[in-house]
């Protein structure tokens, strides 16, 4: 009937479990992943649209990853970390030197990581812009698809396509590029 209805949203994740001697302590990767997924949930919660098919993560691929990737940036922000990241026994906040090491680590190998993501986008587009059904060697097809982004030799007997769940089972078919495009939007 065209009425505005608010979404029901949950973030469901698997985190490190507590041990007998320690509570559940999140890894940096878990914090970053939580922030990413929380960005998707905020996108849905703040959406204000009459039609759910045009709302939240149902937007154009060019924008779908923007809120989640923005949220990831908070993982290395001192002011944000100081609101919750404390030693589980002493309550001390993270030392500035450790936060700087997190920042430095996030910048390490960033060019290679960028090319790797571009290669995944190229592979995604190669699979979803075919005009005829595929018949052939998947590994050979894959290597041809992403050769423009390869700077290191391909590791023998690897095949990304067989485990690329984002594009074959995760709803990102012909849309994986959105991860890199959102980073361009963020940097503007």
Task: Write out the residue ranges for each language-model feature.
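Cation-handling catalytic/transport regions enriched in His/Asp/Glu
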Residues: 1-187
């Amino acid at each position: 009937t065209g009425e505005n209805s608010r979404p029901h949203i949950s973030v469901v994740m698997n985190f490190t479990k507590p041990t007998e001697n320690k509570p559940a302590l999140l890894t940096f990767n878990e914090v970053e992943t939580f922030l990413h997924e929380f960005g998707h949930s905020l996108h849905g919660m703040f959406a204000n649209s009459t039609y759910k098919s045009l709302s939240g993560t149902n937007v154009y691929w060019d924008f779908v990853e923007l809120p989640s990737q923005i949220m990831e940036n908070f993982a290395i922000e001192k002011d944000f970390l100081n609101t919750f990241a404390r030693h589980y026994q002493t309550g001390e906040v993270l030392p500035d030197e450790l936060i700087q090491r997190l920042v430095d680590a996030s910048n390490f190998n960033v060019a290679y990581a960028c090319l790797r993501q571009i290669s995944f986008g190229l592979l995604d587009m190669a699979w979803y812009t075919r005009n005829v059904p595929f018949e052939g060697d998947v590994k050979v097809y894959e290597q041809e698809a992403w050769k423009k982004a390869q700077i290191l030799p391909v590791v023998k007997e690897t095949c990304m396509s067989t485990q690329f769940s984002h594009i074959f089972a995760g709803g990102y078919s012909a849309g994986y590029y959105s991860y890199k495009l959102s980073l361009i939007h963020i940097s503007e």
